[in-house]
Design a protein with these regions (language model features):
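Core of compact, soluble alpha-helical bundle domains
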Residues: 1-131
C-alpha cells in the first residue's frame, strides 16, 4: 500500500488530476465521452483541471471561468456521474488523506449532482446556459 499524503501543493493537485484522468481515459463507460469531447486537446484540459482544483482546494485563485457550459450538451445520465465519482473518490483514497482530500470528494459529489440536474434541466427546455 502506498503512503497516503495530504493535498498541500500544486504538485499534489497535478498528481491527483493526472492519475484520475489516466483512469477516466481507460474506462469503458466514460472514457469514450471524454475522448470524443476533448480529442487532441488533453494537455489544455489537464492544465485547466490543475487550475480548477488548485483554486477549489488550495484557495490559490488560478482558475477563471465557468465549469458547467462545456458539459451542458454531453450525452450523459446519472450512471456516468456515478462512475466519474467512483473513479475520483477511489483515486483520492488510494493516494491522499486528510481534510483537503475529504473536501475534494465532497466537492466532487456536489459538482456531479449540480451538473446532472442542470444537464437534465437544459435537455427538457429550450434554454441554454448563459456562460
Amino acid at each position: 500500500m502506498l503512503d497516503r499524503k495530504e493535498i498541500l501543493s500544486i504538485e499534489d493537485i497535478k498528481l491527483l488530476v493526472d492519475t484520475f484522468y489516466e483512469k477516466v481515459r481507460k474506462d469503458a463507460l466514460i472514457g469514450p465521452i471524454f475522448e470524443d469531447k476533448i480529442q487532441d486537446r488533453w494537455p489544455e484540459h489537464l492544465e485547466r483541471m490543475y487550475r480548477f482544483w488548485q483554486t477549489v482546494l488550495l484557495e490559490e485563485h488560478t482558475y477563471f471561468g465557468s465549469p458547467f457550459p462545456p458539459h451542458a450538451q454531453l450525452p450523459v445520465v446519472w450512471e456516468h456521474f456515478e462512475r466519474w465519482l467512483s473513479l475520483f473518490n477511489s483515486n483520492i483514497d488510494d493516494q491522499f488523506s486528510g481534510k483537503i482530500a475529504e473536501e475534494a470528494k465532497w466537492r466532487a459529489n456536489k459538482m456531479a449532482e449540480m451538473f446532472y440536474y442542470k444537464i437534465r434541466h437544459y435537455r427538457n427546455t429550450d434554454a441554454r446556459p448563459l456562460f
